[in-house]
């Protein structure tokens, strides 16, 4: 009975989403405040109905209701209860329901926290978000219903959750990523509302920017957590592989970063209006593209869900409708919000525009490298591979001017400035950057690699100028805001991430060795000694754990416990890496296959500064969070009268 209730709640949600999509817009056209205000009620009802359906599915997993096909395919009585809850979004149908839940949650949040926003704007924004919800609810109900039954015959035991997903990181990674994806729908809705109304001013930017910041924070955390999970769970010691689905989350992050900065210019200087709208449309469009790549079956990835052609065609049609319709609307009405401001070449807004262009260019490089092999294969032209060298080379050389401008930008005033005002500071920063980028590799690794120097030069340039500018502000007694300190934290976070990338990419050491009890291998300054392998048993798996002692200069450093697990129901063998993490290095061991005569294949790594990559990502997210606390986002703006015909 419960699955039928869940299905009924989804049908109810579809009806409410349809009302939300139409009724408030009708109210805008008629100038009827009550009809416009109904959008908030519909948003609440939509969230409650979808949340109810989601809880029904969670309950089906907790009680092991294997009459539900989705539960039988992704759970097992031996699965710990917390993984049973996480299995709710562990495969295609449930993850789509999570998407719709979060979509309705964002819609409800806009309804709650929009009391200071003119009612006509709220009505348009919530209606557009309702339209997006309609598309995904139709997709779930007609192609991907998580409440489908296996009656009258159903298994007494489930197939189990994919062992790769039986990890704490994967409990939080998809919700965070989806919160970011879905969050950009708010910026998208504000952009479409601006095009419909024909106006975009600083107040619109002030409404949109906190929602964009929140989405960007969640997406940043999702990417950071996913990268860390890949590092410790997959057993290959990497943190980014330029996988198509990794790229699918990275592209909206790049455009979202550009959008945040563009909104700042629109808010401060009433510039970049059309550009800001285009970025908002592009960010959410790229989120839809990522959904298509994961669920269409056009690629093979550890992230991709198996899917049938009907699902792929539905998503493709929906994506074309949303993106195509948005771009057509932009082409037709974008001129109504075009800026009339001429910016000086040496001004903060011009430098921000240059970096916006570089971010979009980086996104296009990733988009080309991701889609070209897929398009080439679909056209019957054979298989081609675009791998890490292409992405690393193209991306690096786009980021060099980006880092240069990023360091200088906060030092330059809005409107017009003179370069000579900061000339001495730039000279000092240049000398400091040169010295640090040459000295640090030699101090930590006793050798200098050109690409490391380049990466450290970018990081030091950003960090030195950010710290120097903050010190100058403090010494002069200049008033600073949460937004300012958020910017400093985010820029320093990027510098920290670049340091981690520069060291880990160029100084990591990897060894694939055959080891048995008593064997030792030297890597960098460390000696790894293989002691033994013991049998272990978990709630739904059994395996072996290898004990590997590590010494440095003859003194004990740490002990690593690398596991090889066999999951009973799934019949899968998984590697659980052993990692000893530190501020400046990671020691990493992954147990491979058992060989003859008691020997094992073992993969050992020395990874310098790798944790700085994720620490920098967390600092960037913290910077975004600080910006959210800026008081100006809580100021009330007087409503503007809406023309009835401007829907």
Curated annotation (Swiss-Prot):
NCBIfam families: nrfE, PRK10369.1. The chain crosses the membrane at residues 9-29, 42-62, 94-114, 121-141, 176-196, 211-231, 236-256, 274-294, 312-332, 351-371, 390-410, 425-445, 448-468, 482-502, 609-629. Keywords: Cell inner membrane, Cell membrane, Cytochrome c-type biogenesis, Membrane, Transmembrane, Transmembrane helix. GO terms for molecular function: heme binding; heme transmembrane transporter activity; oxidoreductase activity, acting on diphenols and related substances as donors. This is Cytochrome c-type biogenesis protein CcmF. Coiled coil: none annotated. It is a multi-pass membrane protein. The keyword Manganese does not apply. InterPro entries: CcmF_C (IPR032523), Cyt_c_assembly (IPR002541), Cyt_c_biogenesis (IPR003567), Cyt_c_biogenesis_CcmF (IPR003568). Belongs to the CcmF/CycK/Ccl1/NrfE/CcsA family. The gene is ccmF. Residues 30-41, 115-120, 197-210, 257-273, 333-350, 411-424, 469-481, 630-647 are cytoplasmic. Required for the biogenesis of c-type cytochromes. Possible subunit of a heme lyase. Pfam families: CcmF_C, Cytochrom_C_asm. The keyword Transport does not apply. It is found in: Cell inner membrane. GO terms for cellular component: plasma membrane. One of its GO terms (biological process) is cytochrome complex assembly. Residues 1-8, 63-93, 142-175, 232-235, 295-311, 372-389, 446-447, 503-608 are periplasmic. It comes from Escherichia coli (strain K12).
């Amino acid at each position: 009975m419960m699955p039928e209730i869940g299905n009924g709640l989804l049908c109810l949600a579809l009806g409410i989403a349809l009302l939300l999509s139409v009724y408030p817009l009708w109210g805008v056209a008629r100038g009827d405040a009550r009809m416009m205000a109904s959008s908030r009620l519909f948003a609440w009802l939509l969230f409650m109905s979808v949340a109810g359906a989601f809880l029904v599915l969670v309950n089906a997993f907790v009680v092991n209701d294997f009459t539900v096909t989705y539960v039988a395919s992704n759970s097992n009585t031996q699965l710990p209860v917390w993984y049973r809850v996480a299995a709710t979004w562990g495969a295609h149908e449930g993850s789509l329901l999570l998407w719709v839940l979060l979509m309705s949650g964002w819609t409800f949040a806009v309804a709650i926290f929009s009391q200071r926003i003119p009612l006509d704007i709220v009505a348009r924004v919530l209606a557009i978000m309702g339209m997006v919800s309609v598309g995904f609810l139709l997709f779930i109900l007609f192609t991907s219903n998580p409440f489908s039954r296996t009656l009258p015959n159903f298994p007494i035991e489930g197939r189990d959750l994919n062992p790769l997903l039986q990890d704490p990181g994967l409990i939080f990674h998809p919700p965070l990523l989806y919160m970011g994806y879905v969050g950009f729908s708010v910026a998208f809705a504000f952009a479409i509302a601006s095009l419909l109304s024909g106006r975009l001013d600083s107040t619109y930017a002030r409404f949109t920017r906190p929602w964009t910041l929140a989405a960007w924070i969640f997406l940043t955390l999702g990417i950071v957590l996913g990268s860390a999970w890949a590092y410790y769970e997959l057993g290959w010691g990497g943190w980014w592989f330029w996988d198509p689905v990794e790229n699918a989350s990275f592209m909206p992050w790049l455009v979202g970063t550009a959008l945040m900065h563009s909104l700042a210019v629109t808010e401060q200087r009433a510039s970049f209006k059309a550009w800001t709208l285009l970025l908002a449309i592009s960010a959410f469009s790229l989120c839809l593209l990522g959904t298509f790549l994961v669920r269409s079956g056009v690629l093979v990835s550890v992230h991709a869900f198996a899917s049938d052609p009907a699902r792929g065609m539905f998503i493709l049609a929906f994506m074309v409708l949303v993106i195509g319709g948005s771009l057509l609307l932009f082409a037709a009405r974008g001129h109504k919000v075009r800026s009339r401001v001429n910016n000086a070449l040496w001004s903060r807004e011009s430098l921000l525009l240059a970096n916006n262009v570089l971010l979009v260019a980086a996104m296009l490089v990733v988009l080309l490298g991701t889609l070209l092999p897929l398009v080439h294969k679909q056209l019957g032209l054979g298989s081609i591979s675009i791998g890490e060298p292409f992405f690393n080379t193209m991306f690096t050389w786009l980021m060099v001017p980006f880092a240069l401008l990023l360091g200088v930008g906060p030092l330059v005033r809005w409107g017009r400035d003179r370069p000579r005002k900061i000339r001495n500071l730039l000279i000092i920063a240049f000398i400091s950057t040169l010295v640090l980028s040459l000295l640090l590799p030699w101090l930590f690794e006793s050798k200098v690699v050109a690409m490391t120097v380049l990466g450290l030069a970018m990081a030091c340039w950003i960090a030195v100028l950010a710290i120097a500018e903050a010190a100058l502000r403090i010494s002069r007694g200049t008033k600073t805001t949460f937004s300012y300190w958020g910017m400093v934290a985010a820029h320093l976070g990027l510098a920290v991430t670049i340091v981690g990338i520069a060291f880990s990419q160029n100084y990591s050491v990897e060894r694939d060795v055959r080891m048995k009890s008593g064997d030792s291998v030297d890597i960098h300054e460390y000696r790894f000694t293989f002691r033994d392998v013991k049998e272990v048993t978990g709630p739904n798996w059994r395996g072996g754990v290898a004990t590997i002692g590590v010494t440095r200069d003859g003194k004990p450093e740490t002990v690593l416990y690398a596991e090889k697990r066999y999951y009973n129901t799934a019949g899968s063998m998984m590697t659980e890496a052993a990692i000893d993490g530190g501020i400046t290095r990671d020691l990493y061991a992954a147990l491979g296959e058992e060989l003859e005569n008691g020997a094992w294949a073992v993969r050992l790594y020395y990874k310098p500064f790798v944790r700085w990559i994720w620490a920098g990502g967390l600092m960037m997210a913290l910077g975004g969070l600080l910006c959210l606390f800026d008081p100006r986002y809580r100021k009330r703006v007087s409503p503007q009268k809406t023309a009835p015909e401007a829907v």
